[in-house]
Amino acid sequence: MNQVKTNITRNFPHISRVMIWDLDGTIINSFHRVAPCFDSEGNLDLNKYKNEACKHDLIMQDTLLPLVTYMRQCMNDANTLNIICTARLMSKSDYYYLRKQGLRGRGDSNIRVFSRDTLHKYFEADKVSEIYHSKDAVYKSYYFGLFKQLYPNADFTMIDDHKGVLSAAASYGFKTLDAQAVNDILSIGVTLIGETFIDESLEDDNDYQFLADRLQLCWEGMTEEERAEYSCSPQQYIEKLKVA
């Protein structure tokens, strides 16, 4: 865990539930512009990303992934604080896109954005550059520590498609959801099963085989071509949840 001095002057002990959302590959499909900027371990090459992938017209071509439906449900829950924690260096175009999609509020909105361009607000100046240039899991770990200070009584859930980030979140005691796997299952098209599955996967007393059997019914009704579009089978997804 990364223990570092922060600039926060108060915390929010009344917050009891925090959902932390990644952007790329979790709720936004930016693959068309961001994919060339990732290294073999899934970390963002910041220079390449900034120079090649951040043009306004490219950002406006991004699309939404199925998990955004669940995110919007959480945004409508007055008892839930939603955090966007992204590896991006957010530009005006990024914030505009979020507002355009109804994912960025103002004033008393129950969603906050933490990104590389907001580091200076929360961390000492001599640490910002080090955190900024860290790999994704390390970079987000600093924010995880900050969140625990800000919301000391909250139950946290991290939704991300980066396995290293999920492992880091788990080390802080956060619940985790593999966004790639969940989006795959949701995109099969059985919305009710998908949303119920997400809720049940967060419960402590899961019967994983029961969940696998339910998903298997969907899987068996698909053609081989349809199955090839997804990154894992239902049983493989269950195994991922067990690890998380």
UniProtKB/Swiss-Prot annotation:
Following host DNA degradation, is responsible for the degradation of 5'-dNMP's to deoxynucleosides that can be further excreted. Active on deoxynucleoside 5'-monophosphates but not active as a phosphatase on ribonucleotides, deoxynucleoside 5'-triphosphates, deoxynucleoside 3'-monophosphates, or deoxyoligonucleotides. It catalyses: a 2'-deoxyribonucleoside 5'-phosphate + H2O = a 2'-deoxyribonucleoside + phosphate. This is 5'-deoxynucleotidase. Keywords: Early protein, Hydrolase. Its EC number is 3.1.3.89. GO terms for molecular function: 5'-deoxynucleotidase activity. The keyword rRNA processing does not apply. Coiled coil: none annotated.
